[in-house]
Amino acid sequence: MANKKIRVRYAPSPTGHLHIGNARTALFNYLFARHNKGTLVLRIEDTDTARNVEGGAESQIENLHWLGIDWDEGPDIGGDYGPYKQSERKDIYQKYIDQLLEEGKAYYSFKTEEELEAQREEQRAMGIAPHYVYEYEGMTTDEIKQAQDEARAKGLKPVVRIHIPEGVTYEWDDIVKGHLSFESDTIGGDFVIQKRDGMPTYNFAVVIDDHLMEISHVLRGDDHISNTPKQLCVYEALGWEAPVFGHMTLIINSATGKKLSKRDESVLQFIEQYRELGFLPEAMFNFITLLGWSPVGESEIFSKREFIKQFDPARLSKSPAAFDQKKLDWVNNQYMKTADRDELLDLALHNLQEAGLVEANPAPGKMEWVRQLVNMYANQMSYTKQIVDLSKIFFTEAKYLTDEEVEEIKKDEARPAIEEFKKQLDKLDNFTAKKIMGAIMATRRETGIKGRKLFMPIRIATTRSMVGPGIGEAMELMGKDTVMKHLDLTLKQLSEAGIE
């Protein structure tokens, strides 16, 4: 195996959108392949037809591309080892099912689901771990054939089970976990390799595919550890060498310490959800790669090229990776600060249009206004959809201050500062950020009020917010009419509150 070319695979099931955990598996396999100048194979494992979602494969492929992951072979681009959808490989699987049946390493099982469940219930009652019990124990070959013929005559459809040898230890040196071993009597008995509908089970099909596609390394989540001894059983039955395995730790919710579950609605878990919020693909790539893998040094922001250069599976963590939403927001903010402004404009415009704040085809002048709005908030946003809430003041009619804002203004010498600032603004012909800041400085000179006592009342009176972007830029975008209306309303409200 050491001399073989590196070939890895990412093999999702088309059961829905691309999950954070699956995206991490894809990223680690991608980085491992690119670091070693190897091959990444995309394979669609769609044998569980009951769980398949229409368009699921296409959705996952699109989101993988969005993240910046490409592959060398797959259902969309072909390759020498196809087909790359398991549903198109049934004849291939049947060949090896037949081989194991002919060699006596597998057999037809006619036990019904009801009989199997009754068997499991009985075992639980006895305090025994549920497992399959060989149904032909003590029978001759002729007796087995007769029993199977009678079952077929009754219209029963069989599954195919593989024999689990007794007293065998299945072991491997895991890239992440180290040496692991399972005794054959802990697997649960002879397991199904072909279902009643003729489709192979996961643990059988994956072995056939990995062997025929010459996969050298299998990097996947550690929820697959219990599958590995079953797969090693199939490898041994067919006389094949197994690939190198590496099982990555689970991802946990940093807020709860529990495994990141699709049922946990406190965390967004699908790549498509982050796309809709306006997260950047480079930031998602960066953040997800650091979920369970540690680069050299203290830096947390890396380019794809740097990740490829550094990636070493030996640095995969043995402890669960914590998914921290605030950390993701911070990482995305770092990327937004240096992102192409046209890219941010496109994302934010989509968010504003979706919220009904900007029309579908804005005129050039309106587009320039939106561009200034986006540039103003770019460093403040964790993702572009935040612009909808941050910029509401620019899309609403002049309104009264909130009680909280009134209380804040009462702390300072608000009225004289606001009255003088209104006079200074009234003199302006060109309502630009530079001129507005000049008006604030003139207010300072005329009133002697300075620092927070000057800036906070003016900010609250004009923008209806105690925090925000540069006050001059914000007022320029609001326009003189709106700002003056806000100042008039503020002075009226202060009078009503008895603040002179």
UniProtKB/Swiss-Prot annotation:
GO BP terms: glutamyl-tRNA aminoacylation
Location of the motif 'KMSKS' region: 259-263
EC number in record: 6.1.1.17
One Pfam match: Anticodon_2
Keyword Ion transport: no
Record: residues binding ATP: K262
Chain ranges for the short sequence motif 'HIGH' region as given in the UniProt record: 12-22
CC per GO annotation: cytosol
Main localization (coarse): cytoplasm
Domain of life: Bacteria
Reactions catalysed: tRNA(Glu) + L-glutamate + ATP = L-glutamyl-tRNA(Glu) + AMP + diphosphate
Subcellular location: Cytoplasm
Transmembrane regions: none
CDD domains: GluRS_core
Matches recorded under InterPro entries: aa-tRNA-synth_I_cd-bd, aa-tRNA-synth_I_codon-bd_sub2, aa-tRNA-synth_I_CS, aa_tRNA-synth_I_cd-bd_sf, Glu-tRNA-ligase_bac/mito, Glu/Gln-tRNA-synth, Glu/Gln-tRNA-synth_Ib_cat-dom, GluQ/Sye
Keyword annotations: Aminoacyl-tRNA synthetase, ATP-binding, Cytoplasm, Ligase, Nucleotide-binding, Protein biosynthesis
GO function term, MF aspect, one: glutamate-tRNA ligase activity
Assembly notes: Monomer.
Role played: Catalyzes the attachment of glutamate to tRNA(Glu) in a two-step reaction: glutamate is first activated by ATP to form Glu-AMP and then transferred to the acceptor end of tRNA(Glu).
Family: Belongs to the class-I aminoacyl-tRNA synthetase family. Glutamate--tRNA ligase type 1 subfamily.
Name of the protein in question: Glutamate--tRNA ligase
Native organism: Lactobacillus delbrueckii subsp. bulgaricus (strain ATCC 11842 / DSM 20081 / BCRC 10696 / JCM 1002 / NBRC 13953 / NCIMB 11778 / NCTC 12712 / WDCM 00102 / Lb 14)
